[in-house]
């Protein structure tokens, strides 16, 4: 790996807080020891002057959100960043901006999980029913909740999945509690899970599962309890001690998540969006033992992932090797877009713990049609088959193309 990486240039843009939290300077030093040059990008200057760049690592979530609020400075920064990417298709970007926009929107990311559920066939995974509330609760709110499969209690979250406010949530137990909900927000069925959350930190083909405290069990159905407002970040800290996480007793099923399920879930998300650095929050339904994805995060904190820098360096090597192989075979720069979107070339270097791609997974899927099909109802509206989320051998390019077209592109236009 040292010989291959020598002379490569990696640019990064992270907030100062993120740099300190990750101790990212240690990663820069690790890269330099491999003969790579690491450049901290200044987006207030033309990126062209700071290149050439083989790889860009970024967390532009704050900037993207501010740009979406029409902040002129942030709009200029995002435009400058996108302009450089468009002019340099050979540069690997971790991760694509349209995908980040999708993950910043809980409604869109939950819809993506639901689409993956419709594509895969496995009873080990369930997608909690959800819906978006765009206006204050009125007479038809309960009807809409029932139509979308929501029952009390349910959890209410901000639509935006980033920033301090994104951790502010509420558990609603009855119709009266709906009056305190401030739209726009996303409501999601609460699933009892014996107060254990599994945070899956993904770096390309590698992932690490970290166990965290979570909300205790609550009785199913409507009750006269007052709504509970809480900060999920505080509840699920490693050292968290809260009355909300104190479990009276373990009820029903209590087991760890399946490695096979996590592998297939992370692979599906990587190939649907072209992302490499993300987190998946998973709970285990204590009645069925099924895995439920309750959140997806872009470039999380990786707390508890001791090999994060090694995994990241290995992933960069994997992607660059795949790009080099594609170029040698075709000589076509346009295909670099495809290699970056997949970001899972066969035979690459992977992290020490778990590889979530089988040998040749991407090459073997080229040219296949996705088994996932959309049904149409009488009115011509596409309707998803009612299937559990599962673990097929791989996700085909046509499924990837479908998800990117219907979600990421839509997100980038907003």
UniProtKB/Swiss-Prot annotation:
This protein's name: Inositol-tetrakisphosphate 1-kinase
GO cellular component, one term: cytosol
Transmembrane segments: none
Organism the protein comes from: Homo sapiens
Cleaved signal peptide residues: none
Binding sites annotated in the UniProt record for 1D-myo-inositol 1,3,4-trisphosphate: 18, 167, 199, 297
Residues annotated for Mg(2+) 2 binding in this entry: 295, 297
Post-translational modification comment from the UniProt entry: Acetylation by EP300 and CREBBP destabilizes ITPK1, and down-regulates enzymatic activity. Deacetylated by SIRT1.
Reactions catalysed according to its record: 1D-myo-inositol 3,4,5,6-tetrakisphosphate + ATP = 1D-myo-inositol 1,3,4,5,6-pentakisphosphate + ADP + H(+); 1D-myo-inositol 1,3,4-trisphosphate + ATP = 1D-myo-inositol 1,3,4,5-tetrakisphosphate + ADP + H(+); 1D-myo-inositol 1,3,4-trisphosphate + ATP = 1D-myo-inositol 1,3,4,6-tetrakisphosphate + ADP + H(+); 1D-myo-inositol 3,4,6-trisphosphate + ATP = 1D-myo-inositol 1,3,4,6-tetrakisphosphate + ADP + H(+)
Gene field: ITPK1
GO-annotated molecular function: ATP binding; catalytic activity; hydrolase activity; inositol-1,3,4,5-tetrakisphosphate 6-kinase activity; inositol-1,3,4-trisphosphate 5-kinase activity; inositol-1,3,4-trisphosphate 6-kinase activity; inositol-3,4,5,6-tetrakisphosphate 1-kinase activity; inositol-3,4,6-trisphosphate 1-kinase activity
Modification sites for Phosphoserine: 396
Record-listed Mg(2+) 1 binding positions: 281, 295
Group of enzyme by EC: transferase
EC numbers for this chain: 2.7.1.134, 2.7.1.159
Primary role: Kinase that can phosphorylate various inositol polyphosphate such as Ins(3,4,5,6)P4 or Ins(1,3,4)P3. Phosphorylates Ins(3,4,5,6)P4 at position 1 to form Ins(1,3,4,5,6)P5. This reaction is thought to have regulatory importance, since Ins(3,4,5,6)P4 is an inhibitor of plasma membrane Ca(2+)-activated Cl(-) channels, while Ins(1,3,4,5,6)P5 is not. Also phosphorylates Ins(1,3,4)P3 on O-5 and O-6 to form Ins(1,3,4,6)P4, an essential molecule in the hexakisphosphate (InsP6) pathway.
Family recorded in the similarity comment: Belongs to the ITPK1 family.
Pfam families named among the record's database cross-references: Ins134_P3_kin (PF05770), Ins134_P3_kin_N (PF17927)
Effect of residue 167 to A/Q: Loss of kinase activity
Residues the record lists as binding ATP: 106, 157, 188-199, 214, 232, 236
Residue positions where N6-acetyllysine is found in the record: 340, 383, 410
């Amino acid at each position: 790996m040292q010989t291959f990486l020598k002379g490569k240039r990696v640019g990064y843009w992270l907030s100062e807080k993120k740099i300190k939290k990750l101790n990212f300077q240690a990663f820069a030093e690790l890269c330099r020891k491999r003969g790579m040059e690491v450049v901290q990008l200044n987006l207030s200057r033309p990126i062209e002057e700071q290149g050439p760049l083989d790889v860009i690592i970024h967390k532009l979530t704050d900037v993207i959100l501010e740009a979406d609020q029409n902040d002129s400075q942030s709009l200029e920064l995002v435009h400058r960043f996108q302009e450089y990417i468009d002019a340099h298709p050979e540069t690997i970007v971790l991760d694509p901006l349209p995908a980040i926009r999708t993950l910043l929107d809980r409604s869109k990311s939950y819809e993506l999980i639901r689409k993956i559920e419709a594509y895969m066939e496995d009873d080990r995974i369930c997608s909690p029913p959800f819906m978006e509330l765009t206006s204050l609760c009125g007479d038809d709110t309960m009807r809409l909740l029932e139509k979308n499969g929501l029952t009390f209690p349910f959890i209410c979250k901000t639509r935006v999945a980033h920033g301090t406010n994104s951790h502010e949530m509420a558990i609603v137990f009855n119709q009266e509690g709906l009056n305190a909900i401030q739209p726009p927000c996303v409501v999601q069925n609460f699933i009892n899970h014996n107060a254990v959350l599994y945070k899956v930190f993904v770096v390309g083909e590698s992932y690490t599962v970290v166990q965290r405290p979570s909300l205790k069990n609550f009785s199913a159905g409507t009750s006269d309890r007052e709504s509970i407002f809480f900060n999920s970040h505080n509840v699920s800290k490693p050292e968290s001690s809260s009355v909300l996480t104190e479990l009276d007793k373990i009820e029903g099923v209590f087991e760890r998540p399946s490695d096979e399920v996590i592998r297939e879930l992370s692979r599906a998300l990587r190939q649907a969006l072209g992302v490499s650095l993300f987190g998946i929050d998973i709970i285990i339904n204590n009645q069925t033992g099924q895995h439920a994805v309750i959140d997806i995060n872009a470039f999380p904190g990786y707390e508890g992932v001791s090999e994060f820098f090694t995994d990241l360096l290995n992933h960069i090597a994997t992607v660059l090797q795949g790009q080099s192989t594609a170029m040698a075979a075709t000589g076509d720069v346009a295909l670099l877009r495809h290699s970056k979107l997949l970001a899972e070339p066969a035979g690459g270097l992977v992290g020490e713990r778990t590889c979530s791609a089988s040998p040749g997974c991407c090459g073997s899927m080229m040219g296949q049609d996705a088994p996932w099909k959309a049904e149409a109802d009488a009115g011509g509206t596409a309707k998803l088959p009612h299937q559990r989320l599962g673990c097929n051998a791989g996700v085909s390019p046509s499924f990837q193309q479908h998800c990117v077209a219907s979600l990421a592109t839509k997100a980038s236009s907003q």
